[in-house]
UniProtKB/Swiss-Prot annotation:
Organism the protein comes from: Chloroflexus aggregans (strain MD-66 / DSM 9485)
Quaternary context: Homotetramer. Forms an RuvA(8)-RuvB(12)-Holliday junction (HJ) complex. HJ DNA is sandwiched between 2 RuvA tetramers; dsDNA enters through RuvA and exits via RuvB. An RuvB hexamer assembles on each DNA strand where it exits the tetramer. Each RuvB hexamer is contacted by two RuvA subunits (via domain III) on 2 adjacent RuvB subunits; this complex drives branch migration. In the full resolvosome a probable DNA-RuvA(4)-RuvB(12)-RuvC(2) complex forms which resolves the HJ.
Record GO biological process: DNA recombination; DNA repair
InterPro entries noted in UniProt: DNA_helicase_Holl-junc_RuvA_I, Hlx-hairpin-Hlx_DNA-bd_motif, NA-bd_OB-fold, RuvA, RuvA_2-like, RuvA_C, RuvA_C_sf
Gene this chain is encoded by: ruvA
Pfam (any one): HHH_5
Organism ancestry: Bacteria, Bacillati, Chloroflexota, Chloroflexia, Chloroflexales
Protein name per Swiss-Prot or TrEMBL: Holliday junction branch migration complex subunit RuvA
Entry comment, domain topic: Has three domains with a flexible linker between the domains II and III and assumes an 'L' shape. Domain III is highly mobile and contacts RuvB.
Length: 195
């Protein structure tokens, strides 16, 4: 398996880039966020990768961080979701946003991603919802979970929401959300349509 690659960008396409290392150019498919952060042709790049082996092809998929790669691995583990579909889903938002959609059971938003219909979106939620939790949502971000958000999560769980639903509601809070527990609770309940 090729777990990572470091090299020089030779070309950038709509859904791939070519990275040359050791005199070999590797075609690597990547989500939009990775492509937009890649830099210009001729610049150095480091990607976390997954090599998918099929009977007729060896295909590399590259990611800017481990959170994207981990989510990609979870997505391709879902029945009916292949690498291209998982890449399309990762291109629709950050790993936290995608996890929030799954944890919150937001089938409508998932189904709006190109290539994902309602049935596939439902299958993704069904198979991954219990595997996405608050710790995973928080761990993939660069900031730690505040004591306020931990308390908010406990309140939401005591109101009958699952830990995954609470995590999705908290992850959906805007970055400039008020620092008071009451206001954050109001915004979190609005996420569920309860406020």
């Amino acid at each position: 398996m090729i777990a990572s690659i470091r090299g020089v960008i030779q070309s950038i396409g709509n859904d791939y880039l070519i990275v040359e290392t050791g005199g070999i150019g590797f075609l690597i498919y990547a989500p939009r966020s990775t492509l937009s952060a890649a830099g210009a042709v001729g610049s150095d790049i480091f990607l976390h990768t997954i090599l998918i082996v099929r009977e007729d092809a060896l295909t590399l998929y590259g990611f800017s961080d481990n959170a994207q790669r981990s989510l990609f691995e979870q997505l391709i583990g879902v029945s009916g979701v292949g690498p291209k579909l998982a890449l399309s889903l990762l291109s629709s938002g950050t790993p936290d946003e995608v996890r929030s959609m799954i944890a919150g059971g937001d089938v409508a938003r998932l189904a709006r991603v190109p290539g994902i219909g309602k049935k596939t979106a439902e299958r993704i939620v069904l198979e991954l919802r219990g595997k996405i939790d608050f710790r995973q949502l928080a761990a993939s971000g660069s900031t730690s979970v505040s004591a306020l958000d931990r308390e908010l999560s406990e309140i939401l769980v005591s109101l009958g929401y699952s830990a995954a639903e609470a995590a999705a509601a908290i992850a959906s809070l805007p970055s400039d959300a008020p620092p008071t527990l009451e206001e954050r609770l109001r915004l979190a309940l609005r996420y569920f349509g309860s406020a």
